[in-house]
C-alpha cells in the first residue's frame, strides 16, 4: 500500500546549536578501524561502530541495516571521526544499527574558487569521493563476515559534501556507469539518506536507468551552499532535494522528502535532531520494504536557524 503524506510540521524538533549543526558530547570509540584503500596521496580508513550491547538488531525477524556514513565539509575539510557526530552515532548504535564512517579524499582542498562555473573541478571532487565510497563498499563486502555486515543490507548516508556523494553514487549505480566497476557485479545499496545533498548531471534532468533504492532527503529551502532547487546551464545541472523530489514523485520512486522551510545549510548537520524521521524511514521503507511515500514541509520556530557555514563565500572564500 502506498501512502503519501503532505503536511507542515511546526513542532517536535530540537534546536540545532553546534557550529556544524551537531551537538558535541562524550566521544564514542569505534569497535574497529581498518584501512580500506591506499591512494597515491593518502591511506583511507573506516571506523566500525557495532550495535550497542543489549540493543535490538532485528525488526520483525529482519536484520537492521548497516549505515555507511560520509562526513561533510565542502570537499575541503572534515573527518570521519569528527566529535560532532558522536551523539548521532550513539543514537543509531543504541537502536541496533551498525555504523561505518569512512574517509574520502578532499578533492577541493586548496581550491580558491568553487561553483558551477568551475564544473570540471567540482565534478572531479565529487567523483573522487564516489570512487572512495565504492572502494570502501567493496572492502566491506569482501570482509562482510569479519565486520558482521550483510552486503545486501547497506544504507549509505551523508552530510553536505557526503550527501552529494551518496546521492551521486546511487545515480551512478542506477545508470551502471564506469564508476561502478569497483563494486561487485549487480550490487545495490539498500537505501540512501541525504542531509542537504544534490546530484551533478551533464545530461540535463536527472534520469535513473534502474529504480533507485529507497531514498530519504532532508534539505533547507533557503540553502545557498548546496542549492535546494537547481543550478542549470543547458545540459549541465546541479540538482538539490527540492528539484530531485519532483523526479522521484513523477516516476513513482520510494522516497521520504523533508523540506525545512526557511532553513539554510544547517540541515546538513541535523542528524541527531531528526532521528525519529530516520528510524521511521529505516524501519518502514528499508527493513520492511514498504513503499511509504512522505513529503513534508517542516517549520519549527524552536529550531535555531543560521548555524554553521551558510554560503560558498564563507566556506571557500569566493
Predicted region positions:
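N-terminal cap/lid segment of alpha/beta-hydrolase-fold proteins
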Residues: 22-62
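C-terminal catalytic histidine-bearing segment of alpha/beta-hydrolase fold enzymes
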Residues: 249-318
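Alpha/beta-hydrolase active-site loop
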Residues: 120-145, 240
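Primarily recognizes the serine-hydrolase "nucleophile elbow" in alpha/beta-hydrolase
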Residues: 138-211
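Bacterial Sec-dependent N-terminal signal peptides
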Residues: 1-25
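Short beta-strand element of the alpha/beta-hydrolase
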Residues: 61-74
Amino acid at each position: 500500500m502506498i501512502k503519501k503524506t503532505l503536511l507542515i510540521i511546526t513542532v517536535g524538533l530540537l534546536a540545532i546549536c553546534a557550529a556544524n549543526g551537531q551537538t558535541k558530547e562524550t566521544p564514542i570509540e569505534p569497535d574497529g578501524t581498518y584501512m580500506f584503500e591506499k591512494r597515491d596521496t593518502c591511506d583511507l580508513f573506516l571506523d566500525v561502530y557495532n550495535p550497542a550491547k543489549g540493543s535490538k538488531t532485528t525488526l520483525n525477524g529482519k536484520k537492521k541495516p548497516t549505515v555507511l556514513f560520509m562526513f561533510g565539509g565542502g570537499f575541503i575539510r572534515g573527518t570521519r571521526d569528527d566529535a560532532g557526530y558522536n551523539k548521532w552515532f550513539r543514537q543509531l548504535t543504541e537502536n541496533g544499527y551498525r555504523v561505518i564512517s569512512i574517509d574520502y579524499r578532499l578533492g577541493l582542498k586548496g581550491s580558491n574558487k568553487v561553483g558551477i562555473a568551475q564544473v570540471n573541478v567540482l565534478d572531479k571532487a565529487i567523483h573522487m569521493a564516489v570512487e572512495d565510497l565504492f572502494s570502501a563498499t567493496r572492502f566491506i563486502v569482501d570482509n562482510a563476515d569479519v565486520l558482521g555486515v550483510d552486503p545486501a543490507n547497506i544504507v549509505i548516508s551523508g552530510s553536505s559534501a557526503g550527501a552529494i556523494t551518496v546521492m551521486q553514487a546511487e545515480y551512478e549505480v542506477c545508470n551502471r556507469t564506469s564508476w561502478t566497476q569497483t563494486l561487485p557485479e549487480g550490487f545495490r545499496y539498500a537505501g540512501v539518506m541525504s542531509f542537504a545533498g544534490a546530484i551533478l548531471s551533464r545530461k540535463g534532468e536527472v534520469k535513473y536507468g534502474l529504480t533507485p533504492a529507497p531514498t530519504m532527503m532532508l534539505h533547507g529551502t533557503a540553502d545557498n551552499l548546496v542549492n535546494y532547487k537547481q543550478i542549470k546551464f543547458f545540459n549541465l545541472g546541479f540538482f538539490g532535494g527540492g528539484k530531485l523530489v519532483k523526479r522521484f514523485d513523477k516516476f513513482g520512486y520510494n522516497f521520504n522528502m523533508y523540506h525545512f522551510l526557511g532553513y539554510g545549510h544547517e540541515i546538513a548537520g541535523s542528524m541527531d535532531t531528526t532521528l525519529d524521521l530516520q528510524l521511521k524511514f529505516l524501519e518502514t521503507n528499508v527493513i520492511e520494504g514498504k513503499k511509504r511515500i512522505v513529503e513534508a514541509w517542516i517549520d519549527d520556530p524552536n529550531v535555531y536557524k543560521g548555524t554553521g557555514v551558510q554560503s560558498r563565500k564563507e566556506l571557500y572564500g569566493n
